[in-house]
Amino acid sequence: MATPSTGANNSIPAVRNQVEVQVGLVGDAQVGKTSLMVKYVQNIYDKEYTQTLGVNFLKRKVSIRSTDIIFSIMDLGGQREFINMLPIATVGSSVIIFLFDLTRPETLSSIKEWYRQAYGLNDSAIPILVGTKYDLLIDLDPEYQEQISRTSMKYAQVMNAPLIFCSTAKSINIQKIFKIALAKIFNLTLTIPEINEIGDPLLIYKHLGGQQHRHHNKSQDRKSHNIRKPSSSPSSKAPSPGVNT
């Protein structure tokens, strides 16, 4: 007696889970937040982006085994008049990416204030520190390259944040930023090689001087580099980004 066929038409399709993950992009104006978002989601680069007015967002789906991950990426305009919209990009975000322009050291100094205000709104988000425009950095004086690299390493250590130098113009480390974000959120093992040589596009995510999610001696580390823990009330009045404290 023939055995009934169990062809493909009779198979039950695998059930896929879907998870939406919010990622906030914050930093000074014209550091490359929109450029990073559009490059990652649409693989498009345009050096003539206009400044973001308020908050922009795009979505991208990635798949891990039987799960579809929807990245909902929030891009906050860096002008001071949009600081009241900071909660849109930070509250509910699993990851907050702090961006600075590698060719403008003042934008790295501003990270102190961005971090203070963002952390006051969402102290459970995973921080990632990203230096943009690496393709322009390599044309600058080697002494400056070393200075900005070492200073950004100190910031990343205090924040206990992965540090990544990227270039949207040259497609350097763009995908890796979000792979690292995904791995940090879901505690996945990463095999991406780290890059920690001065002059190269830094990519450091393992040896951060503490446990994941900044759950180490936070108050002591912030004090040593002037990155302070915010007051317990997120609504308390704080200096605008760009004001060094």
UniProtKB/Swiss-Prot annotation:
Pfam family, any one: Ras
Chain spans, region Small GTPase-like: 16-244
Stretches with biased composition (Low complexity): 229-245
Coiled-coil intervals, chain numbering: none
Gene Ontology molecular function terms on file: GTP binding; GTPase activity
Binding site for GTP: 27-34, 75-79, 132-135
Residue segments, region Disordered: 210-245
One Gene Ontology term, aspect cellular component: spindle pole body
Function noted in UniProt: GTP-binding protein involved in termination of M phase. May play a role in triggering the degradation of G2 cyclin to inactivate M-phase promoting factor at the termination of mitosis. Acts upstream of CDC15 kinase and may be required to activate the CDC15 protein kinase pathway.
Name of the featured protein: Protein TEM1
Higher taxonomy: Eukaryota, Fungi, Dikarya, Ascomycota, Saccharomycotina
Gene name linked to the record: TEM1
